[in-house]
Amino acid sequence: MINPRRSTAAVLVSLLALAGCTSTSDSAATGASAAAPTSTGPVTVTSCQRTIALDAPPQRIFAVFHPAIELAHALGAGDRLVGTAFLDNQILPEYAAAQATVPYNDDYPSKERLYSLTPDFVLSAFNDAFTPDVLGSQNDLAAQNINSYVFGEWCPAAEPGEGKPLQLKKATFETTYTDITQVGVLLGAPDRAADIIARMKAVVDDTRTRVRGADTSVTVAVGTLRDDGTISVQGGSGITQEIIEIAGGTNAYADIATRQASVSVEDFVRRDPDVIVLAPCCGKDMTVADGQKEVDKYTAAPALADVTAVRDKRFIVVPFPGLFSGIRNADTAAQIARALHPDRF
């Protein structure tokens, strides 16, 4: 819900453009969170250089991180979730009731807690979950007869299964579509997966059509101003890069090869972005309304006063999960496009 106390016109424009964030997502909506698998035979997929073979859809799923949790619900597996961890923001409204019945952890559960839930499958949106000191590597889990899948955006570059924090590959919307397809196959919901992808592609196509011919030279920085004075920005290898391109903008940090990087205030001033995208995080009750705190940090920083986006108060606040591979990506691109090019919508 938009905070009525917000008075900065540019912020209000941005948030009004994103008003759909708290309602049912057209590209993600697929009906109820629980649905019987439509495919029940043996399946095999390959992800992150790892082959995953299942004789039947998993019945006891533990989902880690927001994009994985929402994907499980979107695929109709909400009633098969035995536990979840790490929601970044409020879950999409259509899955709220189902999620409320699922055990939830704000942090990683201990291995003992995980094993006590007797999962037969762990679905994670980030590779960090599969490290020996967290949930265990994918090989560790396999030794306990627990299959697992990590989203392709966060595949380790080598040594599949060991969960080591290695350099990651470039992610695109095709990476997201592949994950949705493969997880849909594994969970026995290939038709629902295809429907999600079709809806996302329709939103992307509509957005591209609307911004075609618009001025795409506007520079956009996805950045979080930290308490230590540095700024965490999104580089050119994550899904954010294509989100900005689809929205009709130019990533101010596209030349940075990594997904995220810490930059100095001086570098941020030198790049002088026209628009700053903010994504408040992290907690299961957070919404775009919490973005006002991030806006206030920028506008209160004297060293950033002359940055075009700060001076003109051009901030776009989006839900954090939309900036990482998952079912919200298409809507996030459309929401940013509406704020960058309101005359096209």
Across the structure, where does each feature detected by a protein language model lie?
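Extracytoplasmic ligand-binding site segments that recognize negatively charged/polar headgroups
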Residues: 128-136, 146-182, 215-239
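Proline-aspartate-enriched helix->loop->beta-strand connector
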Residues: 111-124, 265-281
